Amino acid sequence: MRMLTRIALLLAAFTAAPLLAQTAPVPSTPVAPAPKEDLVPVAIDTSLGRIVIALDRGRAPITTANFLHYVDTHRYDGQNFYRAMHMTSAEGGGGLIQGGITTDVRKLYPPIAHEATSQTGIHNVAGAISMAAAGPGTARADFFILLSDMPGLDAGGPGGDANGFAAFGHVIEGMDVVKAIWNSPISATKGEDAMKGQMLDPVIKIIKAERVK
């Protein structure tokens, strides 16, 4: 729950910032696209369809290896997308969906080192996949996919903090499925504090996650 709250609070700070700060890009050195051999495609089959994500093991090797560990041992199979965060039009629109392992902590592996966006050059933009975390070195299995650019989730981003959230890949197929999950019914009462009104009801099942060619 701590990692959920941290994302919610950072997003609240980000969306409360002046519009100029929200839309201004985070200064960074341009990064060349990752070579094909550094990208690992993974399919996430859900009850609403398939999402295919290219994981960037060249620029985010630790985070990618961790995600693949869960994929290869089938620990995401049978789990859920459980959250859909919607930003208002005044906040720039868009949002994110979040999923992972929430029902069986025995399936969790140890937390991993944080790979900041300032280190990898992979930013929290529309279509990116990032790890949920309560702080550096706490990410385990939960992840989110963005439907809009959110520079406030980058390291040192506007309205965010110095660490941000580790982005490690991007959707290459199935953004329509991401949007369908995002548009699914939300409970008006489930969730605590800043998370209230963001919990999917019912949750969207992750049938399986696997590497694909």
Over which residues does each language-model region extend?
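Bacterial N-terminal signal peptides that target proteins for export
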Residues: 1-9
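Long alpha-helical, hydrophobic tracts
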Residues: 3, 18-21
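Bacterial N-terminal signal peptides
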Residues: 8-18
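Cyclophilin-like peptidyl-prolyl cis-trans isomerases
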Residues: 21-213
